[in-house]
Amino acid sequence: MSDINTARLPCIGFLGIPSVGDDIEMVLRHG
């Protein structure tokens, strides 16, 4: 799953945490 998340949002690599990074990115973009 981590591979899919990183593939969808490369920016996640900056955070270093695909799981948490995905949630944060989703909130920031939808927020």
Curated annotation (Swiss-Prot):
Keywords: Toxin
InterPro entries in UniProt: Amanitin/phalloidin
Keyword Chloroplast listed: no
PTM comment text: Processed by the macrocyclase-peptidase enzyme POPB to yield a toxic cyclic octapeptide. POPB first removes 10 residues from the N-terminus. Conformational trapping of the remaining peptide forces the enzyme to release this intermediate rather than proceed to macrocyclization. The enzyme rebinds the remaining peptide in a different conformation and catalyzes macrocyclization of the N-terminal 8 residues.
Proregion residues excised on maturation: 1-10, 19-31
Signal peptide range: none
Lineage: superkingdom: Eukaryota
Single annotated GO MF: toxin activity
Cross-link (Cyclopeptide (Cys-Pro)): C11-P18
Annotated disulfide bonds: none
Family: Belongs to the MSDIN fungal toxin family.
Annotated function: Probable toxin that belongs to the MSDIN-like toxin family responsible for a large number of food poisoning cases and deaths.
Protein name per Swiss-Prot or TrEMBL: MSDIN-like toxin proprotein 8
Gene source species: Amanita bisporigera
Gene coding for it: MSD8
